[in-house]
């Protein structure tokens, strides 16, 4: 890790120091490089022509002309604020939420919707689509990689199925990279900071054949020590170790045709991902089977009860190694008054994890890993045309995905005492569960075909009608097989008798099933927009859309008789009704922008990720919640009174709740007890309900209030004979508390927090920039999420957010 990152950092530094940007006569490059204020709507910065250009509707237009709630973040703003992945991007866009316990278990949500909170299940679609240069990335792991050579990012809020290849019910993250150029140009950047942070980026572009063939190559490497110290291994864990490379060839045989061939490769290999002890919360288990008693029985004490000591003692190997990449071929052909576009793409993802799933320093679970390999193929054809009063886009999309997973989970010598009741003599025999192993084999084949279209009819100069439709076909087939072996390698089978087998089957039960299904769905939307004035537009949208059915790829829970509940192997599709109204305004000679949107999204048969208390058997599975609603208001305000100052305030109120979920799994304080008719109070030993009614309670991971603010000021200055600007920038983000468990629990509310970032530096119009930065400047202690480990012992662990980090960046263009 260190040698690779240092090597690239050295290469980037050499390029940087040799850059003509250090010369008096350095040529000015393109605007995207040389004007650091060419950033984004909602950040107080604007393009030179006072308009933020986007392609959200598959045509080039200004963001203020799009009747849609959209945030646009320019590549320069991403670089200057250190928002180099989706996790950091959420600090700039309040209604974007990102959660990750490791690259596989990552989710991006918009307005509280998108992907269920918790462990990832390959059998469902993402509600928030991630696109890079119009190529759909089906794996949420792509959200954990560093942005590479990005020109801008558009965060589209609300359903996007009638314009995008893959149907997305909550929104889309549309990433556009910088394209090859027929003039030679390049950039180089090096950053260093505390915690051993090192990041290097470089990009070069230029002609191969004058006016016919151009190429672009970009590289990025990031490394940083972990933020949690593991006293068992002596290593800092949850480190960063990213490497990425992207190459493009642009061929323009004539004025009507351009063809782009692109390929990328990304690799991560960090020692990750662990959590820390946070607290215990009483469950309804017998007291001698709750965490304090179980730990005391084995003479175990946590290394620290203060989570922000950032200490752990997990004893299993940790690794989050994965590789992601692919290739695409894009054709744009001007045909008559329109443009035909073809995008052919292949992507892969290889996941090689190692985890500690008992979250302690005891050898309870000694191995937990689900390595996975995915291949994805997409083909999209699109035709767009713009006329005086009518613009339209029609397209066809095909998607095929195959995922193969080989899982292993193994228990150790401390498992018997931890998992078998102390009243059972077998609890004192380590050999009962030591070496007990589950081998899981999973396969998923997912095919989706779609036709879609959207038209924009300008009825008058002020009034526009925009209808859209989508016809979708989905077919999925899966396979799940779990085989169980005892410590001697003898198969453990359902129906076997004897006390030892009963204890082993209570941990792992064999199961095998092959879910499959297919479905047709029709979606549509209608948007009406009206320009009250040249810089004031109001709009309203209704969308009827869906998320395709899902299949449980991580196993299903056992029923009351201990037999796998095969009825749970599939979940119904979501049916979505979305309403939105908004106003977009610019005032003060376009120096100030104020956009307001109000929305309500009702979902029937919401695909929720729920948990049960069977230790190691099924930690999470998919189920349908009858009704869910997300509603709220978003406000984006930015101002730039002069080129010397800009500021922004983006805020949102989101009320996302289960409107009806009467048979949800219960939170830990109502779990782990007996099965009698009289239910004990929460956290009191006794009987537990089979299910809980959580109707009216909040969806996990969603803060009611979120606010992002920022400002930057600059003054003219001369440094070492170079004219430029000295600048000071501040960005802040506030989130109120949110639930961190699928069924809200008193033990897993994450408190609200405030994060402030500061940067101070000097830059020139020629593209040279040097600045120091501090992230989480006030060193706020906060959690990204809290976790409820399996077993209903009452243990709560957490993932602390980054502490204060600081460093410096030097960047140049040539």
Regions found by a protein language model. Give the residues of each.
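Structural signature of Gram-negative outer-membrane beta-barrels, strongest in the C-terminal barrel
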Residues: 250-254, 383-384, 395-399, 442-601, ...
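Membrane-embedded beta-barrel scaffold of Gram-negative outer-membrane proteins
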Residues: 330-334, 339-355, 531-550, 554, ...
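N-terminal Sec signal peptide and the immediately downstream disordered periplasmic leader
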Residues: 1-81, 87-92, 255-256, 327, ...
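Outer-membrane beta-barrel translocator/receptor signature
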Residues: 125-127, 139, 148-157, 162-231, ...
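C-terminal beta-signal and adjacent terminal beta-strands/loops
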Residues: 733-743, 762-814
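Acidic, small-polar-rich N-terminal luminal/periplasmic segments of exported/outer-membrane proteins
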Residues: 46-183, 581
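Gram-negative outer-membrane beta-barrel transporters
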Residues: 391, 595-602, 623-740, 813
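Periplasmic-side early beta-strands and strand-to-turn transitions of outer-membrane beta-barrels
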Residues: 174, 182-183, 191, 203-301, ...
């Amino acid at each position: 890790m260190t040698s690779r990152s240092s090597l690239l950092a050295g290469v980037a530094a050499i390029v940087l120091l040799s850059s003509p940007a250090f010369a008096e006569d350095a040529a000015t490059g393109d605007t995207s490089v040389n004007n650091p204020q060419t950033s984004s709507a909602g950040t107080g910065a604007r393009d030179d022509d006072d308009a933020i250009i986007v392609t959200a509707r598959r045509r080039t237009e200004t963001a203020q002309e799009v009747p849609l709630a959209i945030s646009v973040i320019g590549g320069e703003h991403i670089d200057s604020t250190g928002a180099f992945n989706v996790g950091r991007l959420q600090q700039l866009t309040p209604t974007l939420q990102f959660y990750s316990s490791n690259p596989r278990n990552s989710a991006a949500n918009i307005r509280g919707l998108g992907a269920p909170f918790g462990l990832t299940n390959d059998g469902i679609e993402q509600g928030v689509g991630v696109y890079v240069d119009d190529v759909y990335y089906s794996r949420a792991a792509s959200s954990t990689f560093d942005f590479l050579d990005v020109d801008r990012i558009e965060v589209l809020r609300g359903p996007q199925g009638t314009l995008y290849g893959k149907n997305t019910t909550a929104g889309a993250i549309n990433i556009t990279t910088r394209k090859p150029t027929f003039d030679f140009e390049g950039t180089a950047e090096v950053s260093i900071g505390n915690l051993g942070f090192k990041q290097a980026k470089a990009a070069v572009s230029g002609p191969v054949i004058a006016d016919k063939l151009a190429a672009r190559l970009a590289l990025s490497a990031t490394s940083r020590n972990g933020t949690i110290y593991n006293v068992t291994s002596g290593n800092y864990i949850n480190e960063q170790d990213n490497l990425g490379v992207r190459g493009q060839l642009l061929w323009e045989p004539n004025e009507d045709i351009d063809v782009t061939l692109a390929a990328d490769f990304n690799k991560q290999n960090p020692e990750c991902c662990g959590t820390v002890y946070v607290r215990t919360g009483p469950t309804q288990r017998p007291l001698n089977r709750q965490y304090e008693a179980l730990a005391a029985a084995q003479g175990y004490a946590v290394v620290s009860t203060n989570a922000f000591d950032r200490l752990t003692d997990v004893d299993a190997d940790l690794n989050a190694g994965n590789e992601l990449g692919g290739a695409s071929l894009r054709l744009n052909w001007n045909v008559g008054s329109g443009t035909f576009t073809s995008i052919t793409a292949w992507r892969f993802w290889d996941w090689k994890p190692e985890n500690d799933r008992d979250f302690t320093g005891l050898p309870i679970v000694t191995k937990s890993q689900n390595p996975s390999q995915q291949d994805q193929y997409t083909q999209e054809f699109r035709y767009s045309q713009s006329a005086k009063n009518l613009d339209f886009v029609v397209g066809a999309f095909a998607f095929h995905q195959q995922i193969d997973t080989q899982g292993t989970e193994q228990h150790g010598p401390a498992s018997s005492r931890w998992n078998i009741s102390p009243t059972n003599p077998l609890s004192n025999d380590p050999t009962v569960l030591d070496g007990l192993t589950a081998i899981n084999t999973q396969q998923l084949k997912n095919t989706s075909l779609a036709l879609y279209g959207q038209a924009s009819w300008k009825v008058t100069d002020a009034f526009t009608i925009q209808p859209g439709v989508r016809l979708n076909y989905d077919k999925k087939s899966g396979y799940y097989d779990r085989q169980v072996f005892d410590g001697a390698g003898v198969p453990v089978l359902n129906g076997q008798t004897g006390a030892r087998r009963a204890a082993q089957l209570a941990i792992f039960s064999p199961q095998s099933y092959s879910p499959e299904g297919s479905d047709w769905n029709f979606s549509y939307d209608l948007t009406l927009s009206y320009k009250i004035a040249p810089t004031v537009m109001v709009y309203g949208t209704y969308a009827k859309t869906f998320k395709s059915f899902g299949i449980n790829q991580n196993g299903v829970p056992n029923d009351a008789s201990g037999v796998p509940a095969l009825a749970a192997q599939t979940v119904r599709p979501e049916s979505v009704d979305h309403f939105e109204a908004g106003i977009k305004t610019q005032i003060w000679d376009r120096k100030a922008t104020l956009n307001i949107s109000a929305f309500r999204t009702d979902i029937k048969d919401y695909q929720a990720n729920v948990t049960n208390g069977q230790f190691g058997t099924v930690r999470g599975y998919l189920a349908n919640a009858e009704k869910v609603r997300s509603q709220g208001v978003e406000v984006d305000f930015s101002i730039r009174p002069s080129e010397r100052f800009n500021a922004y305030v983006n805020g949102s109120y989101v009320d996302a709740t289960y409107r009806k979920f009467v048979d949800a799994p219960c939170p830990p304080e109502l779990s782990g007890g007996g099965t009698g008719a009289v239910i004990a109070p929460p956290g009191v030993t006794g009987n537990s309900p089979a299910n809980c009614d959580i109707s009216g309670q909040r969806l996990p991971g969603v803060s009611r209030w979120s606010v992002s603010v920022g400002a930057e000021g600059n003054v003219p200055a001369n440094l070492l004979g170079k004219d430029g600007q000295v600048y000071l920038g501040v960005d802040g983000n506030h989130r109120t508390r949110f639930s961190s468990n699928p069924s809200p629990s008193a033990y897993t509310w994450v408190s609200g927090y405030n994060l402030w970032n500061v940067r101070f530096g000097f830059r020139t119009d020629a593209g040279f920039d040097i600045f120091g930065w501090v992230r989480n400047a006030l060193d706020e202690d906060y959690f990204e999420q809290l976790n409820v480990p399996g077993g209903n012992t009452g243990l709560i662990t957490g993932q602390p957010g980054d502490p204060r980090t600081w460093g410096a960046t030097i960047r140049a263009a040539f």
